[in-house]
Amino acid sequence: MTIGLLGFGVVGRGVYEIIASRQDMKIAQICCLEDPSLPDVRVTRDFQTIVQDETIDTVVEAMGGLHPAYEFVRAAMEAGKNIVTSNKALVAAFYDDLIPLAREKGLKFRCTAAVGGGIGWLSELERAHRVQTICRVRGIMNGTCNYILDSMTRLGLGYDQALKQAQALGYAEARPATDVEGIDTWHKAILSSNIAFGVSLDREQVPV
């Protein structure tokens, strides 16, 4: 497998380190704003060099956000490249566009890491959906909220105190809005429902 990597932040660097230890795959190009000076890897700021590289069969999107991640991913798919992403916001927002395109092109679109990556949540939902009818999906979708609510309920902490404790322990970001305002759970619930029930929910249909 020959990979084009989009983004070289925390996620992108982690992907690079994992793949660098593998013999069955390699990163041919990385598209990012700053040159990380890596051996044996071409670094570019022009995404089109990855799209036009015929040796690259898979693009790993590690940019985050919706734009330009969506435009880059779609262009890569139009060029016949498989996609791997952990970007739950991207997949939730454009599920009914990207998944049909992958089927039309005969491509693999892998987004298991977007929700419960460590337990293979989405891949298990996908397998279950193929062989039986799923009636309900439920679970703890956000670890930050789970910790805060547990601390408030079980320990009697106030919200502000529980949040500060979660931040001190590294469970919550310094800017926790995506977690505590339900956005992260929103994306995960939409994506899980789309796969479990074979539907195409979007952010307009599911209020938060």
State where each predicted segment sits.
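NAD(P)-binding Rossmann-fold cofactor-contacting core
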Residues: S21-P39
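NAD(P)-dependent dehydrogenases' Rossmann-like dinucleotide-binding region
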Residues: I134-C145, P207
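Rossmann-fold NAD(P)-binding glycine/threonine-rich loop
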Residues: Y70-A75, A79, S86-R127
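Glycine-rich adenosine-cofactor-binding loop
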Residues: T2-E17
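Substrate-binding/catalytic subdomain of NAD(P)-dependent oxidoreductase enzymes
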Residues: Q161-V208
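General beta-strand structural signal in soluble alpha/beta enzymes
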Residues: V43-T44, E61, V84-S86, F109-A113, ...
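Oxidoreductase and adenylate-handling cofactor-binding alpha/beta cores
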Residues: I119-I134, C145-D160, H187-L201
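Rossmann-fold NAD(P) dinucleotide-binding segment
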Residues: R45-S86
